[in-house]
Amino acid sequence: MAVAQFLEGINEEITDIRVMASKYDTSRKTALIYIAAPKADLNQVMSFRMRDEEGEITVRDIRSKHLNGKFIGLEISHEMGSDAAWNRFYRFMERMGYA
């Protein structure tokens, strides 16, 4: 089963995902993952983990998003520099969609 977590045992619900490809290097892609209502204690968050039966993808680029001074969620930026990394992320997202 595929899960997305900031902290062990606390599964997060992904609100939105946007994938962008580099204009000059099509093998380089970035996924922006949005979580509007994180369940984890944000003071303890150090990384974002995407786990499934293949293993774990860990991302450390996490940004707090605010609108007019109010917290609206978190944005996780996952950079993929190869087709293999993109394929792995795609397989995870397929599993996450079925979970």
UniProtKB/Swiss-Prot annotation:
Keywords: Cell inner membrane, Cell membrane, Membrane, Photosynthesis, Photosystem II. Belongs to the Psb28 family. InterPro entries: Psb28_c1_sf, PSII_Psb28_class-1. Part of the photosystem II complex. Its main location: membrane. GO terms for biological process: photosynthesis. It comes from the Bacteria. One of its GO terms (cellular component) is photosystem II oxygen evolving complex. This is Photosystem II reaction center Psb28 protein. It is a peripheral membrane protein. The gene is psb28. It is found in: Cell inner membrane. It comes from Gloeobacter violaceus (strain ATCC 29082 / PCC 7421).
